[in-house]
Amino acid sequence: MTGMALRIDDIRELQALLADRLVRTPVVRCPGLEARYGRDTRIYAKLEFLQHTGTFKARGALSVLGSLDKAQLAAGVTAVSAGNHAIAVSFAASALGVSAKVVMTR
């Protein structure tokens, strides 16, 4: 993927990149919440906490790293985070065989 324009081929490439690296998490209805908001309300939750990293952030990290060219990947990546983003970047880098440095505050 390049720039801000998103093409259908970009989506297909990203789908292929993510398919064998992420858990296909379920989508479930939330009847308790639906009852609060009326009978015609349907509320769904995507259970991304079931991902390897425990959050949805692995999708974004894999997407960004997957968009880098070979020279950029060879240089490695750096993330500044002490939370879920750090975990996701570490996971994505490992999955793609890329060196990663995670910087955390004290």
Q: Where are each of the predicted segments found?
A:
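PLP-dependent amino-acid enzyme catalytic core
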Residues: 1-106
